[in-house]
Structure formats: structure tokens, C-alpha cells
Swiss-Prot record:
It is found in: Cytoplasm. NCBIfam families: hslU, PRK05201.1. The gene is hslU. A double ring-shaped homohexamer of HslV is capped on each side by a ring-shaped HslU homohexamer. The assembly of the HslU/HslV complex is dependent on binding of ATP. ATP binds at residues 18, 60-65, 277, 342, 414. One of its GO terms (cellular component) is HslUV protease complex. It comes from Lactobacillus delbrueckii subsp. bulgaricus (strain ATCC 11842 / DSM 20081 / BCRC 10696 / JCM 1002 / NBRC 13953 / NCIMB 11778 / NCTC 12712 / WDCM 00102 / Lb 14). This is ATP-dependent protease ATPase subunit HslU. SUPFAM superfamilies: P-loop containing nucleoside triphosphate hydrolases.
Length: 464
């Protein structure tokens, strides 16, 4: 399947993000260049590195939203991290290499999902066979082997990677006929609500040492593999739910995880994308730096990752040479030139996002696929209430949002969510008790609910 063209990517972003065409174009071109590179000879491919992007603009204008929507659009491993979460090597906290390990985990998840689809029909057949055996159990054999022989068989099975040996059972002609009947009913979907008891692997508990081991590229559970028996728990579920769990277990048995890890590492290295948000908060000029922790040190730690280096992950080494990095920040109290020169040079494409106007707010309220107004209309529809906004009301909401942003801190489109929540507070509260019908939000209603608050600057600061 051919990759999406830059125009197609921009069209998809337009469904959710108003304006900021320059940023959309830059991101779309950078993404499509990944595809162009794959069409070249290998000796040329290795010399073409991604052109990393630095997006600067006020808060609430769409930087993070572009990243969020990109994750849905691109068929590539994508992770979003915040620069403020990282600490310099030597301090307690996440090291910068963890973003690459997160990308490796995401790549494995994507490839694993693709491989599961390939074996799904086989896994379903196997799960149905298991369900038939559980619904019509056989007669347990009275095994008279001595304990030493049982222990030997168990150890041989564990060393061979087969887990604990299953108990043998005897199937009589009567049981065989019953199983054929149950199998037919299963195929016709007649037993979906019947309860069945199954054994499933217990989800691993969070290990406080796990993250530390992960940072060193080690994973003890992977290293031990199948040497230790998997802990299983019994669960009684309807057949439909039980089948889903059994299919998942069968899929894991049918796929080759060595191949999955190899494909995932290749995909993460060749087409992975890392979005670094809040990069302006780690500049030396930012006033919010905590004393003692050098933000410049974090920049210097990020530098080799962006330049291209090899990071150890639990799936193997991952090279960052061809990973695309997109950094974003408001740069309200600093500017891109406050980043260390070496890091600036690694983000050759600079994009400035514009502050939002009143007209932008009107479009944000109405145009996107799941705009704020459409969300509230859908929420009240659940109570049987039809919520309608007049054009004048929408215009007034946008005007108030713009005025409040100008008069207090400018938080961009996020101001709309605060204003709408305050505006519709009473409607949302009374909604379940209202008779089914239509509620129309007019300009007069908006002014009645919000004008007094907007005029009082002290109230505005605390409420809107």
C-alpha cells in the first residue's frame, strides 16, 4: 500500500486542527520523506537522515494536538514524551534513553498486533477446541506412576519450554459424541452465554526494580524465559469472553517472538517518530528551573540521541540514526536560541505556530470532526436532549474566549473548554431530569451566563 502523500496527511490533520498550515506542511513533508528514502538504493539510504522539526508557538495553539493526531495517521512507531520528565545522568529520575526504549516497546506492540492478525483464524480454531474440552471434560486417568517419574517428566517438559505437563484424560464414545454436538453449537454461536472455567496466565505484577533493569537494557523475565512455570489462575467466564482470552494465549504460542523483535527494531530504527514536548522548559533562560538540577545537562544528554547513537533495549540494540524527532515548546519565557547550539543544529526545520484569533475560535468550535460543540451535543443526546447553538451564540463564545485570553494568561484553545463548561453547567446538571426535547443556546443566554464574570477581572482569573 502506497504511503499517504503530504497533501493527504494535511487533509487528515485539517479534520482536527484549525489553521497552522505551515506546521502541518512541515510535518507532512518530513513524514513522506521517510517513504521516499525507502525507494532509494541502500548505499544512498544510509546517508539520508531525517530533517528534525522544532515547533514554537503559544500554549493551546495545536502543537500537542498535531502530535496526538499524527499517532493516529502514521503507520509507524510513535511516542510522545515531555522534556521536563528527564533528569541529567547522576540524578534520580528518567534518563533520556528511556524515550528510545518506549519507542521500542511501541514498535513491538504494533508488529505483535500485525502478526496476531495473521494467525487469528488458527488461534480461534484452537481456542474452540479447548472450549469443547472444558465444556465436556474427559475422564481423568488414574495415573499410577511413581513420584520420581512424574518429577522427571515435569522437568523435561519445563526444560523443553513446554510448561507444566497436562493431565491425561480418557475420551469415551459418549463423550466424543457430546463434544461433536457442543462443537456444532459453538460454531452456531448458541453457547456464548454459557459459563466455563478456564486457566489463564496471571498478569505480571509491577516490579519496582523493573524500570531500573529496563534502563540497563535487561529484562529478567525475558532472560529466564520459559525456565520457570507461568503462574496460572482459574476464571469462570461466559464462553464469549473466555474465547477472547484463550485466543490471545493461542496467538502468543503461534507467533515467533524472535522475528517480531527483529522486525520491530528495524521498523523503530527506520520509521520511528519521537515527539519531545515542552522542550522550552529545559533551556537555561527558563525561570522555573529547580536549583541544582542542570537543565543544560538534560539537553546534552538528549544531543547524542538526536545526533544518532545506539541504545540498548530489552529486545536488542536500537540505532537512532534514522528516527525522526519533532520538538515543541511555547518559548514564552525563552527562545529557541536559548537551547545549546549543538541541539539547535539538530533541528534544521523551524516552524512558528500563530496565536489564535476570534475567527479561529469560531472554526475550532464548529469545524473539527469532533469539535467541542459536537461533544457536548453528543453528551446531552444521551439524556434525550437536543442541544442547539445559534450562530450568534457561537460567535459570542469565541469573542469571550478571545477577550479573556487577551486580558489574562493566553492559554489558546483550552480556554474554550473552560468557558463551555461554565456556560453549560446548569444544562448538564439538569439534563437527566429534563423531559426529552430541544434546548437552544442563544447569544442572550451566553451573555446572561458569562458577561458578569468576564467584566469582573478577579472572577475571570478564578472561574474562566
Amino acid at each position: 500500500m502506497r504511503e499517504k502523500t503530504p497533501k493527504q496527511i494535511v487533509d487528515l490533520l485539517d479534520k482536527y486542527i484549525v489553521g497552522q498550515n505551515e506546521a502541518k506542511k512541515s510535518v507532512a513533508i518530513a513524514l513522506y520523506n521517510r517513504y521516499r528514502r525507502t525507494q532509494l538504493p541502500e548505499d544512498v539510504q544510509k546517508d539520508i537522515t531525517p530533517k528534525n522539526i522544532l515547533m514554537a508557538g503559544p500554549t493551546g495553539v495545536g502543537k500537542t494536538e498535531i502530535a496526538r493526531r499524527l499517532a493516529d495517521i502514521v503507520d509507524a512507531p510513535f511516542v510522545k514524551v515531555e522534556a521536563t520528565k528527564f533528569t541529567e545522568v547522576g540524578y534520580v529520575g528518567r534518563d533520556v534513553e528511556s524515550m528510545v526504549r518506549d519507542l521500542a516497546n511501541e514498535a513491538v506492540r504494533i508488529v505483535e498486533k500485525e502478526e496476531f492478525v495473521k494467525v487469528e483464524s488458527q488461534a480461534i480454531r484452537q481456542a474452540n477446541k479447548t472450549l469443547v474440552r472444558l465444556l465436556v471434560p474427559g475422564v481423568k486417568r488414574n495415573n499410577r506412576q511413581n513420584q520420581m517419574q512424574q518429577m522427571q517428566e515435569m522437568m523435561q517438559s519445563l526444560l523443553a519450554g513446554g510448561g507444566m505437563p497436562e493431565e491425561t484424560e480418557e475420551v469415551t464414545d459418549e463423550i466424543r459424541n457430546q463434544r461433536l454436538s457442543v462443537a456444532e453449537k459453538l460454531d452456531r454461536g448458541l453457547l456464548e452465554n454459557e459459563e466455563v472455567t478456564i486457566e489463564v496466565e496471571q498478569a505480571p505484577k509491577a516490579n519496582p526494580m523493573g524500570d531500573m533493569m529496563g534502563q540497563m537494557g535487561m529484562d529478567m523475565s525475558s532472560m529466564l524465559g520459559d525456565m520457570l512455570p507461568k503462574k496460572k489462575v482459574k476464571r469462570t467466564l461466559p464462553v464469549g469472553q473466555a474465547r477472547k482470552l484463550l485466543v490471545q494465549e493461542e496467538e502468543k504460542k503461534l507467533v515467533n517472538y524472535d522475528d517480531i523483535y527483529q522486525k520491530a527494531m528495524d521498523r523503530a530504527g527506520q520509521s520511528g517518530i519521537i515527539f519531545i514536548d515542552e522542550i522550552d522548559k529545559i533551556t537555561a533562560a527558563d525561570k522555573r528551573n529547580s536549583a541544582g538540577v542542570s537543565r543544560e545537562g538534560v539537553q546534552r544528554d538528549i544531543l547524542p540521541i538526536v545526533e544518532g547513537s545506539t541504545v540498548s533495549t530489552k529486545y536488542g540494540p536500537l540505532s537512532t540514526d534514522h528516527i525522526l524527532f519533532i520538538a515543541a515548546g511555547a518559548f514564552a519565557e525563552s527562545k529557541p536560541s536559548d537551547l545549546i547550539p549543538e541541539l539547535q543544529g539538530r533541528f534544521p526545520i523551524r516552524v512558528e505556530l500563530n496565536a489564535l484569533t476570534k475567527d479561529d475560535f469560531v472554526r475550532i468550535l464548529k469545524d473539527p470532526q469532533n469539535s467541542l460543540l459536537k461533544q457536548y451535543i453528543a453528551l446531552l443526546k444521551a439524556d434525550g436532549v437536543d442541544l442547539v447553538f445559534t450562530a450568534e451564540a457561537v460567535d459570542k463564545i469565541a469573542e469571550i474566549a478571545f477577550e479573556v485570553n487577551q486580558g489574562t494568561d493566553n492559554i489558546g484553545a483550552r480556554r474554550l473548554a473552560t468557558i463551555l463548561e461554565k456556560l453549560l453547567e446548569e444544562v448538564l446538571y439538569e439534563g437527566p431530569d429534563m423531559e426529552m426535547g430541544q434546548i437552544t443556546i442563544t447569544q442572550a443566554y451566553v451573555e446572561q451566563k458569562l458577561s458578569d464574570i468576564v467584566k469582573n477581572k478577579d472572577l475571570t482569573k478564578f472561574i474562566l
